[in-house]
A protein has these predicted regions:
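Intracellular alpha-helical coupling/juxtamembrane segments of multi-pass membrane proteins
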Residues: 248-272, 284, 288-302
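Charged, low-complexity surface segments at secondary-structure and domain boundaries
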Residues: 125, 276-277
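Short N-terminal helix-initiation segments at or just after the protein's N-terminus
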Residues: 9-11, 271-275
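ABC ATP-binding cassette signature C-motif
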Residues: 1-255, 259, 308, 317-486
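Generic structural signal for secondary-structure transition and capping sites
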Residues: 207, 278, 300-303, 460
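Short, flexible, glycine-rich and Lys/Arg-enriched loop motifs at helix boundaries
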Residues: 149, 278-280, 284, 309
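Hydrophobic stripe of amphipathic alpha-helices that form coiled-coil interfaces
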Residues: 105, 112, 130, 269, ...
Length: 486
């Protein structure tokens, strides 16, 4: 049975620059589909069209009748004063309405009205089937899985950060228990435990799932088919992300081989036609014209597009000591909340250290203490004399977002004009894009720009706080390779 049918969708925001250009595909009931594509390929636009938030210029979307569809990135507006608990419980509004009607009817059952009794039976069956008797159990289970603690549930929803709102909305969406889930970057604001929990939830979910994600490990564990948006249309891969990556490269090499074969044939035919024209006989000219028509048909095949990759590497400063960093008995608290106590750590040249912990455990705070941006309450932090730190923060900010990318490299990265162009080009900022203001960049583009500023610095100690947040799949693969080579 088909849950979603997309037929010849077209959408453009600027005349002559289509985002979707005849997009056609279908999703069967129970499928787990990854929606992939470069930044700007139209993935989020597609989701917004599926949910009715935007209208396509033409084409149609057909959803299976009666199926409910939920989108994680769609954060509704709630009444002023709503707490996290209130927002989560809106998932049960329909069940609560049924419960209220059941109570109302039960007070009238003594009348012996058969129609009323039949209505009560139907409502009770629907209430039970919808999980009405399991509301509290489901709420506690999902909050535990996504790390939403009891005290956090008392906070005002309006006061939460964008990431926190997204996590609460994910929990609410799961509680609603829709038949079709649309997940747009669901792991961006989840810690490791919550991500593992979400993977397990999806594996047991009985409905249909469409996922946009730049986390290839998450994709490998949650999807069984890929729809890639490319030039406004769909390309299909019957497997998870690992299959997609291998198959995409195989297709590219096969298309390139075919293209080169055709170009060689065009060259041979062109030379044959040229010689025939030189003889300038009626018979040979006719044959030459026939060959030239054949060449025109062959010339319609475009060279397959090679995937652009980032090419920069971290600059490396010399280091003349064993200890880059030492922490001894470091502790930190905010009021009565102790983040960590008696932290002792020694970092030596060549170490690769992962800092793990639940959301709120103090990972970013510890990094800020190491960098001198946050004072510790006790203990000592010492850096080696020749340490040169390269730091990528979790929240990317620029001191002058009104500046263009080009000017940012000139004034904040100390580049001359040619260096600015060259370094931006290595990070796939080319042509007129370098004159866009930083303020209009997407989260992924801002991360790339910050990395561009960082990469040519001579550093010997990298501190990366959630470095893959907002980066696309290619950029994530690149940063892994760059760190491995550092």
């Amino acid at each position: 049975m088909i849950d979603i049918a997309v037929r010849d969708l077209k959408k453009e925001y600027e005349v002559g620059q289509p985002v979707l250009d005849g997009l056609t595909f279908q999703v069967d009931t129970g499928e787990r589909v990854g929606i992939l594509g470069r930044n700007g390929a139209g993935k989020t636009t597609l989701f917004r069209i599926l949910t009715g938030q935007e209208e396509a210029d033409s084409g149609e979307v057909i959803l299976s009748p009666g199926k409910r569809l939920g989108l994680i990135s769609q954060i509704p507006v709630y009444p002023a004063g709503y707490t996290v608990e209130d927002v989560l419980r809106t998932a049960f509004d329909d069940l609560k309405a049924m419960e209220a009607e059941l109570h109302q009817i039960s007070d009238q059952l003594g009348s012996g009205d058969k129609d009323l009794l039949a209505r009560y039976d139907r409502l009770q069956a629907a209430y039970e089937a919808g999980g009405g008797y399991e509301i509290e159990t489901r709420l506690e289970k999902i909050c535990a899985g996504l790390g939403i603690e009891r005290a956090f549930r008392d906070k005002n929803f309006a006061d939460l950060s964008g990431g926190e709102k997204t996590r609460i909305n994910l929990a609410r969406l799961i509680l609603v228990d829709t038949e079709i889930l649309l997940l747009d970057e669901p792991t961006n604001h989840l810690d490791l435990n919550a991500t593992v929990w979400l993977e397990d939830y999806i594996s047991h979910y009985k409905g249909t799932v469409l996922v946009i994600s730049h986390d290839r490990y998450f994709l490998d564990r949650t999807i069984s088919r890929v729809v890639e948006l490319k030039n406004g249309r769909a390309e299909f891969y019957a497997g998870n992300y690992s299959f997609y990556a291998v198959e995409k490269e195989r297709r590219y090499l096969e298309q390139l081989r075919q293209y080169k074969k055709e170009q060689a044939e065009i060259q041979r035919l062109s030379e044959t036609a040229r010689i025939m024209h030189e003889h300038n006989t009626e018979h040979l000219n006719k044959r030459a014209f026939s060959i030239e028509k054949r060449i025109a048909r062959l010339n319609q095949t475009a060279r397959p597009e090679e995937r652009k990759k980032l090419k920069a590497k971290f600059g490396q400063a010399e280091f003349h000591a064993d200890d880059l960093l030492s922490l001894r008995e470091v502790n930190k608290a905010f009021g009565s909340q102790v983040l960590f106590d008696h932290v002792t750590l020694r970092v030596e040249d060549g170490d690769r250290i992962a800092l793990l912990g639940d959301n709120g455990a103090g990972k970013s705070t510890l990094l800020k203490i190491i960098l001198g941006e946050e004072p510790q309450d006790g203990g000592t932090v010492k850096q080696g004399l020749t340490v040169k730190v390269g730091y990528l923060p979790q929240q990317i900010r620029f001191s002058h977002p009104e500046r263009s990318l080009y000017d940012t490299m000139l004034y904040e990265a100390g580049c001359n004009a040619q260096q600015a162009r060259d370094r931006l080009g290595k990070f796939l900022f080319q042509g007129e894009d370098v004159f866009k203001p930083v303020s209009v960049l997407s989260g992924g583009e801002q991360s790339r720009l910050r990395l561009c500023m960082l990469m040519d610095e001579k550093v010997n100690f990298l501190i990366l706080d959630e470095p893959t947040n907002h980066l696309d799949l290619d950029s994530r693969e690149w940063i892994e390779e760059a760190v491995e080579e550092f």
